[in-house]
Amino acid sequence: MISKQGWINLYKPKNITSFKAINSIKKNFQITKIGHAGTLDPMAEGVLPIAIGKATKLIPYISIMKKEYEFTITWGSQTTTDDSQGKILFESNYFPTKNEIEKKIINYLGYINQIPPKVSAVKINGKRAYKLFRENETYTIEPKKVFIENLSITKHSTDKTSFKIICGKGFYVRSFARDFAIDLKTYGHISSLK
């Protein structure tokens, strides 16, 4: 039996939304008051902190804590979703070297301005960006100030680089991949996120 108060650290698998993961718990355990601290992209896997009952009051405090991700950028193409689930928008046959990537990392530490992905949960005039995208609406997402505490390469091959990052609230790894690739004079998208 599950308590009707407290926290569940749910390991969300790939290819389901955070919303679907929460609804499954809500339905299967007849929980009325439930919420989550942050959202994981559908293609991402990892821990999704879920608050139940009175614990939902703590969500704003948990949400501001630092997050750690491991992710891989595939170089050479930018997609509509900034991950491997989207359609290819742009392509390049230029792949950055490990040395070029390492030199750019320093520019991204600390506070940076970041434009969230076109397909995201960001609200624009009360409507989620992903809904506007599906309806083929034209819209602009304003940049947000985000924080990167640490960023390091964990693995590199010709067309892919894996990283580990510690970042603050509101950071989009997909946006980072898109912008970082453009800064390296190529295109890129997230092919794995954990």
Task: Please provide the spans of the model-predicted regions.
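Catalytic/RNA-binding core of pseudouridine synthases
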Residues: 1-194
